Amino acid sequence: MYAGYRCNIDGNHESFIAKNGKTYMEAHHLIPMSAQDDFENSLDVDANIISLCPVCHRKLHHGIDIDDDLRRLFNSRVELLKQSGIEITLVDLKKYY
């Protein structure tokens, strides 16, 4: 909803054109759905869903050098998350990764 088919880590990252005619991106829950029990409000909301190119998506799941990326994503979403009733600090977000 917020990304316009661009990678939220770096809007210049390129991907291929999908069958729907849009640049292919992957949806990722910034706060993982596996953490839902730690939150009163649903994590499955637009404010918590980010758009990532396939490489950045894999990096967040499997990479070791993700602190800068998490900080950038957190800073871009913290206010939207609050508006959705989801309160989290960067320190706590990093614990899920």
PLM features: residue spans?
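Short cysteine-rich loop/turn motifs with clustered Cys
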Residues: 1-28, 53-55
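Polybasic, low-complexity binding patches
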Residues: 31-94
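PLD/PLD-like phosphodiesterase catalytic module centered on the HKD motif
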Residues: 97
